[in-house]
Amino acid sequence: FDGRHARAEAAAKGSFVLHAPKGEVHIAPMPMRSQTGSVMFDALFALAQQEMDQDRVDAIRDPAFDEGRPVPCECFQTGARWPYVWTRDVSFAADLALARLDPKRTRQSLQFKLSAARDGHTPGLFVAQDTGSGGSWPISSDRVVWFLAARHLLEDRAFADQVWQALQGTLAQDRAMVFDAQVGLYRGETSFLDWREQTYPDWTREDVRFIGDSYALSTNVLHYQALRLAERLAGQHGDARAADYKAWADALAKQIDARFWREDIGQYMSYIGEAAHPVPYAKVDLLGLSLGILAEVLPPERARRALAAYPMGPAGSPVVWPQEAQQPIYHNRAIWPFVSAYSLRAARQLDDAPRIAAEIRSLMQGA
């Protein structure tokens, strides 16, 4: 790709050697193995597991917490430059793979993001919101992504009880403070796309009120998923609120489809304006679309049309479109592999063979 070449060869006992432009990488045998027609694919699957070890830590730290002192936690840290546990990062990673590859450490990482109320007497557990534009909650309100990960780990009874407690507290809090009954959607920033002018109008760099009062496709889909989980768990607990959660989810699904869809361009918009002007802005994002498809909240024909028309280049699919020439590269003008992975899942659900092939190729090239 782009004038660069790499090849992989199988070695002894399930190991591999990757010959890449920057040198050789020796990949040890891993607990999970794939056996496909591509040695490169199998090697990269092993490499992903080998690199996962670099994120396994016994303590985490962040300069914003306890003066940067280590906090004991057998967790997955976010990365070399982010040696902490962040709600959306660990949740998306867990939903995609970590919950299956290392359920215990994933569960411990998720538990680190649960908190009691700071006032010391309000009952319940709540999911911590990551920082974002304007600080944190409620400008950013995608903390419910935590439940996207937690749903895979409910076989642990103690953890399942925590999930149920956190669902009740977090959903009640968001219903009171973030949900807009007039519009029928939850307010707040796009999930993951949390750098103001990178994806929102340039003037939001100095004024985040618009972001906090707007409505994002991705974040509303995550709220929908959390409500469906609450409906299921409430039913299992014999809790009459199961009917409320179902009604809220059903109504939210209708509003997501009705308000974010633009028939003239055949796409679901990334976000729409505040209640006074709830119009879709001319911006689409691949994560929001993919999450909507996977949640089955978007009608199949519209979903197929939108995914098939989403822009793609030789390197893969950008996370947002259109891109802004005057803005630096980060979310803007960029491909993020985890978003490509969700696009791949969405394509598989819709049997979109060209998109499946393209996203696999993009992920392999990036790796």
What kind of region is each of these model predictions?
Residues 217-259:
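Active-site neighborhood of glycoside hydrolase catalytic domains
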Residues 162, 185, 241, 245, ...:
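Short, glycine/acidic-rich hinge or "gate" loops at secondary-structure transitions
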Residues 113, 153, 167-170, 174, ...:
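Alpha-helical solenoid scaffolds that mediate protein-protein interactions
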Residues 3, 35-84, 108-136, 179-214, ...:
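Extended glycan-interaction surfaces of carbohydrate-active proteins
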Residues 83-190, 216-224, 334-356, 360-361:
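Aromatic-rich carbohydrate-recognition surfaces in CAZymes
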Residues 106, 242, 249, 303, ...:
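Solenoid-repeat scaffolds in large eukaryotic assemblies
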Residues 1-83, 157-159, 164, 168-176, ...:
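Acidic/polar, glycine-enriched structural segments that form the non-catalytic walls/loops
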Residues 154, 231, 235-238, 297, ...:
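Short coil/turn linking the two alpha-helices of tandem helical-hairpin repeats
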